[in-house]
């Protein structure tokens, strides 16, 4: 399935909510007003893009001629955000960090995935996590020794194998070219953002 841009995902969610609340889809003018477009024509262009991706069906000749495919109510719930550059001090799932949404069933991973993170570098290549991959992440705040985590160390986000010994945390790469990252919790900040639960190989997904 093709990914949605954040704006497309926002419009799709608006359509879904409007149908749930009123029993009918919004008009183009209503979409434009609620999302700050300058005209209904701008909303129409986004609707055409959603239709091309199979997310909605457009019925000509009526102002409310928007329909969700029969399976779409399920698929919408399966949109996983792809997290891009993370700003210092901001929650990892803040809307401004979301590059786009991928329509993938989060339950295909165990535990269920909450977001995707694009892998940078080759520090985890020995366990099949390669640069450019999309790493599926289950959001948690604590980890057990030996688990592969997404961790934030003093606002730098990294993917490593976790090990805690007293007040020290070691983040191990799966590549002999990289030394462990040592974190002293008495004077450094470390946040567990989630557990790695799977990989989508870049290029195979789109």
Swiss-Prot record:
Q: Sorted alphabetically, which Gene3D superfamilies does this protein's record hold?
A: Umud Fragment, subunit A, Winged helix-like DNA-binding domain superfamily/Winged helix DNA-binding domain
Site (Cleavage): residue numbering on this chain: 88-89
List the gene name: lexA
Organism the protein comes from: Shewanella sp. (strain W3-18-1)
| Recorded coiled-coil stretches | none
Active-site annotation: 123 (for autocatalytic cleavage activity), 160 (for autocatalytic cleavage activity)
- What positions does the DNA-binding region cover? 28-48
The protein's name is LexA repressor
The UniProt subunit note reads as follows: Homodimer.
The catalysed reaction is: Hydrolysis of Ala-|-Gly bond in repressor LexA
